[in-house]
UniProtKB/Swiss-Prot annotation:
Belongs to the endoribonuclease YbeY family. GO terms for biological process: rRNA processing. This is Endoribonuclease YbeY. It holds the Pfam family YbeY. GO terms for cellular component: cytoplasm. The gene is ybeY.
Amino acid sequence: MLEIDNQTPLESDFLSLEKIANVLAPTQTIELVLVSDETMREINRDSRGCDYATDVLSFPLEAIPHTPLGSVVINMPLAQESALKLGHRLEDEIALLFIHGVLHLLGYDHEKDKGEQRQKESELIKTFNLPLSLIERAQD
């Protein structure tokens, strides 16, 4: 299940995100928070000590029965900017960021996992007919 808190005026179709959530975590709730650039900067500064806005952050919760898997926070203005720059829909960019974030909630770590997260993202991109992922774009 997906719980969405859109704190921005930007609108999007979230149906594909429900499908992605059901594939990746069929028995767990995922919270998706859509924020402004400034809010993302504050969250990044407070949680990671990095004083800049980023595109997506993940906050896993402890593995306690009947609690959400965690929260994925997406910077909507940055997602919109990336979608325009890369020539695809905002919904696709949000889906890519969401996949990336949920994989982190599930324990994947592209900085340490020897390509496992990249492989899983690639599989999901094909399944949901999406453009290149964050990791794939970074490596191109």
